[in-house]
Each structure stands twice: as structure tokens, then as C-alpha cells.
């Protein structure tokens, strides 16, 4: 009886956990959102351009750049 439960557990575990991670790739929108969040976090570092420091009508560049003097908005 114990062997039966062990086999059942291994079968269910392998089908749910391993199957979910191997057979189903990460959806592209979720992956894209994660990459955008990482880029936003890079821009939020203290030495990078911050959007809230920019005057009205100016924005930080797409590529995060280090600002030595001023908010470096374009």
C-alpha cells in the first residue's frame, strides 16, 4: 500500500510541477513586463535620471544614463 502511494505521489508531482515548468514556457507579456520593471528599477537608482526631477515637457531618455550634474532630462 505504501508503494502505491509513493508511486502516486511521484506521478502526480512529476506531472504537475515538472510538466508545468518544462512544457509551458513563460508567456511573453509577463516576461516583457518583468524586463520593463527591471529597466525602470535601473532608472530609479540615485545616480540615474529620475522622471520626477525633470521639468514639465522633458523626460528621461529610454536608455538609462548616469547623471553627473542636474536631472539630465531631454
Swiss-Prot record:
Major place of residence: secreted
Tissue expression: Expressed by the venom gland.
Membrane recorded as keyword: no
Propeptide residues, chain positions: 20-41
Taxonomic superkingdom: Eukaryota
Signal peptide span: 1-19
GO CC annotations, alphabetized: extracellular region
Keywords: Cleavage on pair of basic residues, Disulfide bond, Ion channel impairing toxin, Neurotoxin, Potassium channel impairing toxin, Secreted, Signal, Toxin, Voltage-gated potassium channel impairing toxin
PTM comment: Contains 3 disulfide bonds.
GO MF: potassium channel regulator activity; toxin activity
Localization per Swiss-Prot or TrEMBL: Secreted
Keyword Secreted included in the entry's annotation: yes
Role of this protein: Inhibits voltage-gated potassium channels.
Family, as annotated: Belongs to the scoloptoxin-07 family.
Designated name of the protein: Kappa-scoloptoxin(07)-Ssm2d
